[in-house]
């Protein structure tokens, strides 16, 4: 049976919006636009993603904290460039009860301005560095564009942010490399191939020295940013007076970095791995990795259900998340429900399987079925789950790579966007004026230049298609979410 991805590719927006509700991820009907209710199944998946993030944070020496959601306007105003980047997006708290507040408060859009006044109290000596903390919290941004669950929302409810402070620019750079390694581990855990780009000056995070963004390719040829890393140098340290005493007794400002992700990670998983039947979850994050569907006949119900429960218990003991569907409905309806929810592997057992000590494994990613011996069930299930994960990654990698096109002219770039969208790589002189002109002509956003920067150098002899000067870089453009 062939996997169908017609609606997934041709009418992605409708497919995605329907699936978010029918698969039990979120309910969009909450009476505040852009703020959605997490449903139990969706939250379980997100918690499995976060479990991996927590483990990576622990492995790399980050400590978890939890800051208040309200930030005084006086703290928010300390970093001018940061305010300029966020002032149109913040929610203001102006009253306590009926009384106007002396100092207005904002609901955090991100936590730099909340955290760094405390950093200036906590960091005193070179012995306190490197200082590495993180939190997963709700943040609030007044999005004026069209909202979409998990992708563009006004309450980002699973916002991960790691903040670090260092005694030198070089150590901060080492932290960025560690962030990239953590992100790569997470992306493999989610079977998500991605690209990293260094953002252009006009699109870096407000207050950053430079910003990196991780993008994935969505089914409609648009890109989705699912992670960011920023090196702040000493920009925020000077605004918030975060200094430390050196070994020689001098005082220096710290160097800072941040690393951020959100529930867009789950949006990417749903979008990239799905098909016309619904979600296809990587086994690593599926709340149920294996569903067992008993298919009894009237005279064999007790034996078939007992056999299904026996297999489930053995899989559970082996650490596999398993569920036996004993609902009194037709097997076909059960298949439909679990395929919609993206359960990676289905085991079907009937009277013949009980008699022959066998079971049928049905893969969600390929819809293929194989019959296996009951005695080898744990080994076969593990092997199949690993194969599903690897297949999801390779399929998504091929999709991403097939949607990256290198061109030399604006006309060629336009043709790519008209044909299939995706990512266009084009020579660029490095001047902001030319970059903005290309954004305008292509009706696309410059993602930046490939990172690490040795990948970003333009081949010799290439010209910027706007000004005709020698190209310094290869720049990436895409239509984005």
UniProtKB/Swiss-Prot annotation:
InterPro entries: aa-tRNA-synt_IIb, aa-tRNA-synth_II, aa-tRNA-synth_II/BPL/LPL, Anticodon-bd, Anticodon-bd_dom_sf, Pro-tRNA-ligase_IIa, Pro-tRNA-ligase_IIa_arc-type, Pro-tRNA_ligase_II_C. SMART domains: ProRS-C_1. Its EC number is 6.1.1.15. Pfam families: HGTP_anticodon, ProRS-C_1, tRNA-synt_2b. The keyword Nuclease does not apply. One of its GO terms (cellular component) is cytoplasm. It catalyses: tRNA(Pro) + L-proline + ATP = L-prolyl-tRNA(Pro) + AMP + diphosphate. Keywords: Aminoacyl-tRNA synthetase, ATP-binding, Cytoplasm, Ligase, Nucleotide-binding, Protein biosynthesis. Consists of three domains: the N-terminal catalytic domain, the anticodon-binding domain and the C-terminal extension. PANTHER family: BIFUNCTIONAL GLUTAMATE_PROLINE--TRNA LIGASE, PROLYL-TRNA SYNTHETASE. Homodimer. Catalyzes the attachment of proline to tRNA(Pro) in a two-step reaction: proline is first activated by ATP to form Pro-AMP and then transferred to the acceptor end of tRNA(Pro). This is Proline--tRNA ligase.
């Amino acid at each position: 049976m062939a996997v169908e991805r017609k609606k997934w590719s041709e009418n992605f927006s409708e497919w995605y919006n329907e699936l978010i509700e029918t698969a039990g991820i979120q309910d969009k009907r909450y009476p505040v636009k852009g703020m959605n209710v997490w449903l139990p199944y969706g939250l379980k998946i997100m918690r499995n993603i976060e479990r991996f993030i927590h483990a990576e944070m622990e492995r790399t020496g980050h400590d978890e904290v939890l800051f208040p959601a309200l930030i005084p306007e006086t703290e928010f105003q300390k970093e001018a460039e940061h305010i300029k980047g966020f002032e149109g997006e913040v929610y203001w708290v102006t009253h306590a009860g009926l009384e106007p507040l002396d100092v207005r408060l904002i609901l955090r859009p991100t936590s730099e301005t909340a955290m760094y006044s405390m950093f200036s109290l906590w960091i005193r000596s070179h012995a306190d560095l490197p200082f590495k903390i993180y939190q997963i919290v709700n943040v609030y941004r007044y999005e004026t564009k069209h909202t979409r669950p998990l992708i563009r929302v006004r309450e980002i409810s699973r916002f991960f942010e790691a903040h670090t402070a260092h005694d030198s620019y070089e150590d901060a750079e080492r932290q960025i490399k560690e962030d990239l390694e953590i992100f790569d581990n997470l992306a493999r855990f989610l079977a998500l191939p991605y690209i990293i780009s260094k953002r252009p000056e006009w699109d870096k995070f407000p207050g950053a020295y430079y910003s990196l963004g991780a993008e994935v390719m969505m089914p409609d040829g648009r890109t989705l940013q699912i992670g960011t890393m920023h090196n702040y140098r000493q920009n925020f340290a000077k605004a918030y007076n975060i200094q430390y005493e050196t070994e020689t007794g001098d005082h220096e400002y710290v160097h800072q970095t941040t690393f951020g992700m959100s529930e867009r990670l789950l949006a990417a998983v749903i979008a990239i791995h799905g098909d016309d039947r619904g979600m296809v979850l990587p086994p690593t994050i599926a709340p149920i990795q294996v569903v067992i569907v008993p298919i009894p006949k009237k005279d064999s119900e007790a034996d078939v259900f007992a056999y299904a429960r026996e297999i489930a218990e053995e899989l559970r003991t082996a650490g596999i998340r398993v569920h036996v569907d004993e609902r009194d409905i037709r097997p076909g309806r059960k298949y439909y429900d679990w395929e919609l929810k993206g359960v990676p592997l289905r085991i079907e057992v009937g009277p013949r399987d009980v008699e022959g000590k066998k079971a049928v494994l049905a893969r969600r990613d390929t819809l293929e079925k194989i019959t296996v011996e009951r005695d080898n069930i744990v080994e076969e299930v593990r092997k199949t789950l690993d194969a599903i994960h690897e297949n999801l990654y390779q399929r998504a990698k091929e999709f991403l790579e097939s949607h990256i096109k290198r061109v030399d002219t604006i006309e060629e770039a336009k043709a790519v966007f008209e044909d299939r969208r995706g990512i266009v790589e084009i020579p660029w002189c490095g001047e902001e004026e030319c970059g903005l002109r290309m954004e305008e002509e292509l009706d696309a956003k410059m993602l930046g230049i490939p990172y690490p920067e040795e990948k970003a150098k333009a081949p010799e002899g290439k010209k910027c298609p706007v000004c005709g000067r020698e190209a310094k870089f290869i720049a990436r453009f895409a239509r984005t979410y």
